[in-house]
Amino acid sequence: MLSPKRTKFRKQHRGRMRGVASKGNTIAFGQFALQAQDCGWVTARQIEASRRAMTRYIKRGGQIWIRIFPDKPVTMRPAETRMGSGKGNPEFWVAVVKPGRILFEMGGEDITEEVAKEAMRLAQYKLPVKTKFISIDKNLEAPSQEKTKNSKKSQEEVKQ
């Protein structure tokens, strides 16, 4: 399972999850991705379970990129202990996820959109946050250029 090799401090505050993801919110490696819709903590076990589900489904077809890393320790006290006597020991690691964050990416020549969608759906069940499937649109640049050309033409027509 994923966890940092070493950290500066053993224990962290829980913190607050406000706003949307400003980093890691675009597809960088593959053609298809799983994007978070709400905020939450994703544990190292959940990441590993999702990864296994996707890998089993695509077999050896493509490649999977994990875009989140559990770098926040969550501490817990032993059961039936009295209040006080300090903060508990780190029990597991979580990745803080905000809306818009890309969790997993998938790509490769053998991967079709249907296969990627089904693999991501299997991974989705293992995660505590609501997610959606997104893909890179290959004709993304062409329509935007046409719109600017059309808008320039319409502006010229209006001037005349």
From Swiss-Prot:
Pfam families: Ribosomal_L16
A GO cellular component annotation in the UniProt record: ribonucleoprotein complex
A biological-process GO annotation: translation
GO molecular function, one term: tRNA binding
Region (Disordered): 138-160
Transmembrane segments: none
Keywords, alphabetical: Ribonucleoprotein, Ribosomal protein, RNA-binding, rRNA-binding, tRNA-binding
Cleaved signal peptide residues: none
Family in the record: Belongs to the universal ribosomal protein uL16 family.
Quaternary structure and partners: Part of the 50S ribosomal subunit.
Biological function: Binds 23S rRNA and is also seen to make contacts with the A and possibly P site tRNAs.
PANTHER family cross-referenced by the UniProt entry: 50S/60S RIBOSOMAL PROTEIN L16, LARGE RIBOSOMAL SUBUNIT PROTEIN UL16M
Entry-linked NCBIfam families: rplP_bact
Protein name: Large ribosomal subunit protein uL16
Organism: Prochlorococcus marinus (strain MIT 9215)
Encoding gene, per UniProt annotation: rplP
